[in-house]
């Protein structure tokens, strides 16, 4: 009883700090169920977070959205699919898009989220005016998402589109033309022709096209490639 009383006497700010050190969402969920004070402390700890990663966790639309909505000061959000059974859909992106933190996000990773479409991505991107780093590799997005990114994300510096096989030269040209701060783009596994890379470099000569082989193909004729 004395130990419980001592815990109960801990200031709310101290409890929130302790919970901010927790790396397990399961632990935070259990702590929220202890009492109203602990629930408030957990919520306060989430509000302080600037980074949030669900790597290794089995998440769904509701649980992901709930945590993002609590993280008022969030700057970096990683909801990549890193575990079998992790299922986040367009509905989850719709919910996340209404979170207070979204307009301040500078980094978002949706890598491998095969259940999302252009609809969800466009909805989320419509709120991200501060985005600098975006990873949408391993998804089935099309040029529709690229057009939305080009219109909204003028601060964008890096974008990953690994194996995004449905994007075309048209979408990439619009993206690079409008995102003038873009420094790096990963196009491994896409189906765009070498001529597209040449066009991208014409628009932005300093652009880093990854992997390096793509850049070499764009800059050198085939005979020189064999000599390298």
Curated annotation (Swiss-Prot):
Gene3D superfamilies (UniProt xref): 1.20.1280.50, Ribonuclease Inhibitor
F-box domain span: 4-51
Pfam families: F-box-like, LRR_6
Classification via SUPFAM superfamilies: F-box domain (SSF81383), RNI-like (SSF52047)
Family annotation (PROSITE patterns): FBOX
SMART domains: LRR_CC
Top-level taxonomic group: Eukaryota
Protein known as: F-box protein At5g67140
Species, as recorded: Arabidopsis thaliana
Taxonomic path: Eukaryota, Viridiplantae, Streptophyta, Embryophyta, Tracheophyta
């Amino acid at each position: 009883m004395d130990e419980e009383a001592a815990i109960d006497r801990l200031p709310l700010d101290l409890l929130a700090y302790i919970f901010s050190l927790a790396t397990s969402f399961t632990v935070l969920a259990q702590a929220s169920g202890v009492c109203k004070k602990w629930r408030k402390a957990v919520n306060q700890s989430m509000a302080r977070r600037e980074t949030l990663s669900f790597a290794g966790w089995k998440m769904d639309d509701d649980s992901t959205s709930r945590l993002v909505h609590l993280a008022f000061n969030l700057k970096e959000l990683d909801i990549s699919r890193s575990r079998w059974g992790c299922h986040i859909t367009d509905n989850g992106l719709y919910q996340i898009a209404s979170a207070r933190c979204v307009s301040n996000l500078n980094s978002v990773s949706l890598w491998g989220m095969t259940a999302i479409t252009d609809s969800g991505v466009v909805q989320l991107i419509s709120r991200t005016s501060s985005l600098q780093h975006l990873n949408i590799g391993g998804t089935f997005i099309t040029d529709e998402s690229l057009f939305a990114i080009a219109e909204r994300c003028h601060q964008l510096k890096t974008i990953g589109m690994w194996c995004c096989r449905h994007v075309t030269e048209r979408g990439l040209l619009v993206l690079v033309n409008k995102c003038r701060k873009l420094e790096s783009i990963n196009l491994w596994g896409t189906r765009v022709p070498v001529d597209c890379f040449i066009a991208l470099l014409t628009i932005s000569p300093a652009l880093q096209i990854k992997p390096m082989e793509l850049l070499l193909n764009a800059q050198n004729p085939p005979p020189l490639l064999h000599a390298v």
